[in-house]
Amino acid sequence: MTKTQDYFANLTGTLATMPAGDLAIAVGVEHRKEYGEFSPDALAQSGGSTDLAAGPTSGGYSLDEVYAEVQVPLLADVPFAQELTLSAATRYSDYDTFGDTTNSKLGLKWKPVDSLLVRSTWAEGFRAPDVSNLYGGASQTFSFYTDPCDTAFGAARGNARCLQDVPVDFRQPANDADGIANGPGTQTPIPFVAGANPDLTPETSESVTLGVVFSPSFAPGLNLSLDWWTIRIENTIVPDTETQVLDDCYLRGIEARCNASTGSRFVRDADGQITSFITTPINVGHVETEGFDFDVNYRRTTDWGTFSASWLSTYISKLELKTDDLEDNPPQQLNGLSVGTGANFRVRSNLNLGWERGSWGISWGMRYYSGLKERCNFDDLCSLPDYSAPWTGGQRLRLNERPSTTFHDVQVRYQAPWNASISLGANNVFERYGPPMFSQPNSGYSYYGGYDIGRFLYLKYQQKF
């Protein structure tokens, strides 16, 4: 159950009339309360069902906000400045959980001539931890991890801290027939616990965009736009992991990670075996991405009907993820890679062609996904068993290259005179399937969930009253 109470007031209007236009402002205040609750029954909480045990969630937070926006027309209808407009906004937010934050935005629009628009923005942002991050119920998990004190595969085996906590012949237990780890990244034989963290703070971001829009006078109905953007998110909220906690304790000597009383923490018995492990989300690391958006729209009316075309493409030039604050640990470069958290396509592109005449319309669409590379564990399945690139830092990686995929869609529609619309269509007309990817299990199959699964036919009726 979720509950939101929101009280707000705002005022918009013109503060003054300037030579280039009206000086517009907007101000407002808001008070909001968020509450969430989830109460699994006793059987689910005990782990007696077919699922793992899940604890109850209950909690909320409140905040007060005030904001102001202004739009200032600097120039208009003069040579090389048909329009020059500056916009600015700022918002102050005060949360009863982590405190307060102020975030601002600046924007500039410039039209040197009627057919060309140049636009740019700079903005700050934040994402506050939600109820599940702060107060989510603890749930069981059978995690995969590497104990650094394991005498066969542990990177800290034999150091003083390990010898203090485990026997000299310590082996990490495993959830298999042998009961002993036979490699790094072994699954725990007993359930660990993943919980929430009431001490989380917001993620913060900074973004910059710069773009142009061209509407040539020699081609009425044609609009082209190109935008460059970059976004960096700091203090990201990420799941803490058992391996990270243990490495911090035994490899990096961070004492607080060895004896934590809150947050992520673990307990060993007299034989050195971990009998309890709790992990929580933490604020750490960053995400940085950069890319381009390209958009083409064309519409022309003729005696044979109205023809339209729309082509929207995104090219990602950088996607970087860092889930720790260790200077000697480089960030992960994920652009063009398929990993367990998702498929990071370098290029996504959608093309739509349409025709309309009277009450009838036809559209054809194409959806393009660029190829991907994924980690490969077996040489005989790797198309790139010895891959190296600047982003690998000199490492040789075993990768599998998966091809690009394009899906086609078609629709025929009729606008009925009784204010209704009838559509007959098919998504993935040619019944195309994306490539299997071993890093993207979906419903038990190695298939990225964003791809179509077979052809989809539909008949749709919409009635307006």
Where do the language-model regions lie?
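Outer-membrane beta-barrel transmembrane domain signature of Gram-negative proteins
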Residues: 1-85, 324-351
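Transmembrane beta-strands of outer-membrane beta-barrel pores
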Residues: 15, 29-37, 74, 90-96, ...
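Short loop/turn motifs that connect adjacent beta-strands in outer-membrane beta-barrel proteins
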Residues: 16-23, 75-84, 115, 155-161, ...
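Gram-negative outer-membrane beta-barrel transporters
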Residues: 27, 223, 227-376
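C-terminal beta-signal and terminal closure region of outer-membrane beta-barrel proteins
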Residues: 54, 123, 136, 140-141, ...
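Structural signature of Gram-negative outer-membrane beta-barrels, strongest in the C-terminal barrel
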Residues: 54-157, 161, 193-219, 229-231, ...
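Outer-membrane beta-barrel signature, preferentially recognizing the C-terminal barrel domain
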Residues: 131-224, 277-292, 343-346, 452-455, ...
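C-terminal beta-signal and adjacent terminal beta-strands/loops
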Residues: 234, 317-318, 366-384, 413-465
